[in-house]
Regions:
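N-terminal hydrophobic/helix-forming segments and targeting peptides
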Residues: 1-150
Length: 150
């Protein structure tokens, strides 16, 4: 199933915005199901994810295999929330039959053996593998293509 998100936020009920994916798309747990409700902090807290050991970092969370929803925020943000207030939670998302985009290249070599390089671009805002992996794979392919000509 493909997942698409249009809008997602947590704000004080009829008041100040607290968490918004317009500020950082890591704020929403990947594959969150649609939600539009008002909650107290006790119920909301079960859906908030932080990294207490890294209080300024927003964690990356996803729920591919279980329908759920949640928000990710810095631990410092969590500590600043007024826990006595009510919260409006909105996740405007949808699931649908999608398609798989991919790229491939096959380079013949001297041997009949095959070597497969695989990479992905499925995690948002994570440059450590989401852009570095495809870039490195392209560089290796270019190098092997040039080397094979000589």
């Amino acid at each position: 199933m493909e997942w698409r998100i249009k809008e997602a936020y947590v704000k004080y009920h009829k008041s100040k915005m607290l968490i918004n994916i317009k500020n950082n798309n890591l704020h929403l747990m990947g594959y969150s199901e649609p939600v539009n409700k008002v909650l107290d902090f006790k119920k909301l807290k079960t859906k908030l994810h932080t990294l207490p050991d890294q209080p300024n970092a927003i964690p990356y969370r996803t729920s591919y295999y279980k329908r759920d929803w949640g928000f990710c925020l810095t631990h410092n943000q969590l500590n600043k929330i007024d826990k006595k207030k009510k919260f409006h939670v909105l996740i405007n998302s949808k699931f649908f039959k999608g398609y798989l985009n991919y790229g491939e290249i096959f380079l013949k070599g001297r041997s009949k053996k095959e070597i497969l390089f695989s990479t992905n671009i499925c995690h948002p805002s994570l440059a450590n593998n989401e852009i570095s992996g495809p870039v490195l794979a392209m560089k290796i392919a270019k190098y092997l293509k040039i080397k094979n000509r000589n």
